[in-house]
Amino acid sequence: CCGPTACIAGCKPCC
């Protein structure tokens, strides 16, 4: 779940 919209998707650990 990482990518340009990771934070928006709620994948905080991926930020």
Curated annotation (Swiss-Prot):
Coiled coil: none
Record carries keyword Lyase: no
Molecular function per GO: toxin activity
Modification 4-hydroxyproline, positions: 4, 13
Distribution of this protein across tissues and organs: Expressed by the venom duct.
Domain of life per record: Eukaryota
Predominant location: secreted
Locations listed in the record: Secreted
Cysteine amide carried by residues: 15
One GO CC term on file: extracellular region
Disulphide bridges, residue numbers: 1-15, 2-11, 7-14
Record's keyword terms, sorted: Amidation, Disulfide bond, Hydroxylation, Secreted, Toxin
Protein family per UniProt: Belongs to the conotoxin M superfamily.
Entry's free-text remark on domains: The cysteine framework is III (CC-C-C-CC).
Name of the molecule in the record: Conotoxin tx3i
Organism field: Conus textile (Cloth-of-gold cone)
